[in-house]
């Protein structure tokens, strides 16, 4: 009996120790625009501390195995830096990926450029997220993107599966509007943090949520076993994208999806499937982003 209890205790300890955090992020900071040589040590410190914070923080109650962690990248370009105040003006390019079933291919799930990734940072500043008492815009933005990455990843596996975590991102938005930085408030910019999340959760854009699920789970994940059926499912998902665009033509969300998925979609249909399928894919993508006509011409061949 004692041996059995010992084994159970050992198993529980192993399970707890084998649980991993949700994100596996790579942070890169580019500072070529900054001539001040004093900054390099600070920038290197910021890069390491940000990466450790994102990867070591437990963002949700979810239990992930190491191999299930979500790959993501935070590429930060410093445009301005005040060494006296510690104020940074930077641009963030964030993207997350997930593996496609039965393949070695990773697909981009969510990618966004944030031109207002501005914050104050001094070496030694605490890096911890306290939802009810956060005063750091840097920490708020990282928390927002962490929840967005997790939420959008869940959306790709089940219909509206990321709702809880997208609402957590929404909570960050609501609590950060008094921090005094751009990106959190409505009407500043339709592509800002508030605008993209608000539009995505808007019932009028429900087609986007159908798209995220059907494109990935019903489409890409079956591409190896049944390419024709998978392409048909992806086209059906793109019809939902078209519906979302028609419902809110001024929303940036449908166009954002086409920007980071365009090349992948072209590769899926170019020279494959039926001519009717290729023509329909062309029409959908062109209607959302007419400036991409030259790139879309591959679908016509």
Kindly label every feature range from the protein language model.
Residues 21-89, 100-102:
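Start-of-domain marker
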Residues 84-195:
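Acidic/His-rich structured neighborhood in mature extracellular/periplasmic domains
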Residues 32-40, 128-136, 246-247:
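Second-shell loop/turn segments in exported
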Residues 158-250:
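Flexible, glycine-rich surface segments
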Residues 1-23:
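Bacterial Sec-dependent N-terminal signal peptides
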Residues 51-59, 151-154, 266, 270:
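Sec-exported extracytoplasmic/periplasmic mature domains
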Residues 28, 213-301:
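A cross-kingdom marker for long, charged
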């Amino acid at each position: 009996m004692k041996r059995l209890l010992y084994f159970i205790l050992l198993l529980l300890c192993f399970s707890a120790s084998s649980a991993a955090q949700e994100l596996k992020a790579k942070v890169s900071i580019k500072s070529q625009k900054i001539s001040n040589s004093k900054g390099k040590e600070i920038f290197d410190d910021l890069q390491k501390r940000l990466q450790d914070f994102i990867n070591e923080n437990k963002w949700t109650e979810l239990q992930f195995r190491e191999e299930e962690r979500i790959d993501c990248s935070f590429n930060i370009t410093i445009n301005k830096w005040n060494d006296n105040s510690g104020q940074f003006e930077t641009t963030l390019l964030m993207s997350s990926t997930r593996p496609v079933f039965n393949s070695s291919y990773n697909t981009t799930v969510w990618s966004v450029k944030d031109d207002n990734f501005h914050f104050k940072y001094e070496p030694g500043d605490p890096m911890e997220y306290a939802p009810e008492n956060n005063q750091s815009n840097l920490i708020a933005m990282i928390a927002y993107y962490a929840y967005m990455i997790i939420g959008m990843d869940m959306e790709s596996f089940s219909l509206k599966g990321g709702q809880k975590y997208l609402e957590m991102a929404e909570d960050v938005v609501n609590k950060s509007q008094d921090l005094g930085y751009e990106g959190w408030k409505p009407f500043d910019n339709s592509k800002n943090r508030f605008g993209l999340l608000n539009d995505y959760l808007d019932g009028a854009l429900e087609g986007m949520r159908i798209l995220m699920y059907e494109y990935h789970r019903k489409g890409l994940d079956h591409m190896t076993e049944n390419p024709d059926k998978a392409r048909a499912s992806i086209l059906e998902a793109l019809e939902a994208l078209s519906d979302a665009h028609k419902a809110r033509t001024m929303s940036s969300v449908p166009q954002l999806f086409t920007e980071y998925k365009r090349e992948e979609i072209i590769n899926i249909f170019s020279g494959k499937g039926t001519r009717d399928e290729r023509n329909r894919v062309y029409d959908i993508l062109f209607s959302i982003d007419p400036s991409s006509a030259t790139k879309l011409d591959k679908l016509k061949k």
